[in-house]
Every structure is written in structure tokens, then in C-alpha cells.
């Protein structure tokens, strides 16, 4: 039993509040245990240079953390006059993950900007940002679709993420901060609702891990993501039937120009 009384294969309580921000085209507050992230989606007609004239859209992301989202105050990136390496890595991950669930031709020549602002951090902020980012992206696309700006709904797959790791020799799902800080192995998994992997980030922080342990972590993560996607579907209700109405364009989904 873990410090918060969860089983090793149990995700933290998850709550997603849809349309959390009044002005954004899509938004949500996602809570995974004590981790809380506000995510917004903004539609912009100015696509990156490599997409101009292509008729295709793009998804990009930004990630930041409030100074007191953590136990000790962190300096804002803007006050350091540069984006921290951690924030840069995370926002690239979020963008890549969400692009795997969109058809850029159906989106049209526009960009959706996903802003992830962590207001309270207790581990798993990047995975929560991806899971919440999908909801915000979905609602931004729905606005375009409902207003008949686009003909086809461009979201092709559900996308969600979770962390897994090895603590005290035990494979665990959805690590909180204390578990993450002492984990011998730390891994982040991103998958879609077809059971396909989008990204695997894994590091032996304290000790190497075996192939058998790796397989156990993948299976734990797969089970966790399936449960998280079930929550996403509950939040979207009947709207989730729109997902997958157009197929994925594999050629454009694999671009990583950022």
C-alpha cells in the first residue's frame, strides 16, 4: 500500500472540469490527485512558415508553472529571460502528443495553441497537461465544426498520458511527487484509445531495469491510460462520438518541426 493508500496499479482520483475558462475556444481544469492544471486552447489563423499554403493546420503547446505551485517558490521563466530546459522539453512533448490525434487537412490552415498552466504540482504535471490538453483541443475543434468553419471534425483519436515507475523495487502507476522523487525508474507514457503508443519516455534514475520490469511498466501504463480515456469520454458525453469521423493523415502527423 502506498502513502496515499492506493494500490500499486491504481491511478489517483481524476476530475476534469470542461469549459473552465470563459474566453478560450476550449479549456478545462484537470485534477489528478493533488496535481491541478488549467489548460486552454486558442485558435489562430497564422500557421507556422512550414505550413503556409499547405492547407494543413498545426497544434503547438506552451507549459508553465505558477511560482507557488510547488512547496518552495520557483522563479517565473520570464524573470529568467529564458524558457527553462524543463519547460521547453515538456511543451514539445505536449505538442507532439496532441498532434498524434488530429487530421491536419481536416483542421485547415490554422493553428491551435494549447496553454498548460500548473497551479498545483504533486507529480505528473506533464501527463495531466496532455490529458487535459486533449479536452481543450477537442472543444476548440468542436467550435470550428459547430460554426461550420470546417467541414469535417478533425480529432481522430483520444489521447491521454500517465506516469509509471519503480519505487522500492515495486512497479507503480501514476506517481505522486514523493514517489517520483525517490523512484529508481521514472517513465511517462502517451497512448491513444486504440491502445497504440504515441510516446515513451523512460529513465533509470537510480538503477537499470530489466526487460521484464519494462513490460510490467508498459502494461501498468496501458491499463491506467484506458481508465483515463474512460474519464475523458464521460466528460465529453455524446460529443465523443465525433472522434474518429475522419481518418488520421499519417504523413502529416509525424512532422516535428518545432
From Swiss-Prot:
Leading EC class: transferase
Pfam families with a match to the protein in the record: RNase_PH, RNase_PH_C
EC id: 2.7.7.56
Keyword RNA-binding in record: yes
Disulfide bonds: none
Ligand binding (phosphate): 86, 124-126
Transmembrane segments: none
Domain of life, source organism: Bacteria
Record's keyword terms, sorted: Nucleotidyltransferase, RNA-binding, rRNA processing, Transferase, tRNA processing, tRNA-binding
Reactions this protein catalyses: tRNA(n+1) + phosphate = tRNA(n) + a ribonucleoside 5'-diphosphate
Gene Ontology annotations of biological process type: rRNA catabolic process; rRNA processing; tRNA processing
Gene Ontology terms for molecular function: 3'-5'-RNA exonuclease activity; tRNA binding; tRNA nucleotidyltransferase activity
Function text: Phosphorolytic 3'-5' exoribonuclease that plays an important role in tRNA 3'-end maturation. Removes nucleotide residues following the 3'-CCA terminus of tRNAs; can also add nucleotides to the ends of RNA molecules by using nucleoside diphosphates as substrates, but this may not be physiologically important. Probably plays a role in initiation of 16S rRNA degradation (leading to ribosome degradation) during starvation.
Family indicated by similarity: Belongs to the RNase PH family.
Subunit note: Homohexameric ring arranged as a trimer of dimers.
The protein, known as: Ribonuclease PH
Organism whose genome encodes this protein: Caldicellulosiruptor bescii (strain ATCC BAA-1888 / DSM 6725 / KCTC 15123 / Z-1320)
Phylogenetic lineage: Bacteria, Bacillati, Bacillota, Bacillota incertae sedis, Caldicellulosiruptorales
Amino acid at each position: 500500500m502506498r502513502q496515499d493508500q492506493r494500490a500499486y496499479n491504481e491511478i489517483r482520483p481524476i476530475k476534469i472540469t470542461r469549459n473552465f475558462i470563459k474566453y478560450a475556444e476550449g479549456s478545462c481544469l484537470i485534477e489528478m490527485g493533488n496535481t491541478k492544471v488549467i489548460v486552454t486552447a486558442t485558435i489562430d489563423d497564422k500557421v507556422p512558415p512550414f505550413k503556409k499554403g499547405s492547407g494543413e493546420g498545426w497544434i503547438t503547446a506552451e507549459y508553465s508553472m505558477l511560482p507557488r505551485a510547488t512547496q518552495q517558490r520557483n522563479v517565473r521563466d520570464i524573470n529568467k529571460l529564458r524558457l527553462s530546459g524543463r519547460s521547453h522539453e515538456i511543451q514539445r512533448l505536449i505538442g507532439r502528443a496532441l498532434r498524434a490525434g488530429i487530421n491536419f487537412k481536416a483542421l485547415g490552415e490554422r493553428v491551435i495553441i494549447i496553454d498548460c498552466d500548473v497551479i498545483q504540482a504533486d507529480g505528473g504535471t506533464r501527463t495531466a497537461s496532455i490529458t487535459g490538453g486533449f479536452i481543450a483541443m477537442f472543444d476548440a475543434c468542436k467550435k470550428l465544426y459547430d460554426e461550420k468553419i470546417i467541414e469535417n471534425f478533425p480529432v481522430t483519436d483520444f489521447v491521454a498520458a500517465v506516469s509509471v515507475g519503480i519505487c522500492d523495487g515495486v512497479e507503480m502507476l501514476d506517481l505522486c511527487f514523493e514517489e517520483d522523487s525517490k523512484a529508481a525508474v521514472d517513465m511517462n507514457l502517451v497512448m491513444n484509445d486504440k491502445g497504440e503508443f504515441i510516446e515513451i519516455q523512460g529513465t533509470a534514475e537510480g538503477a537499470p531495469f530489466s526487460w521484464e520490469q519494462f513490460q510490467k511498466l508498459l502494461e501498468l501504463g496501458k491499463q491506467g491510460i484506458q481508465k483515463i480515456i474512460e474519464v475523458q469520454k464521460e466528460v465529453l458525453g455524446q460529443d465523443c462520438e465525433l472522434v474518429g469521423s475522419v481518418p488520421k493523415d499519417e504523413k502529416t502527423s509525424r512532422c516535428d518541426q518545432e
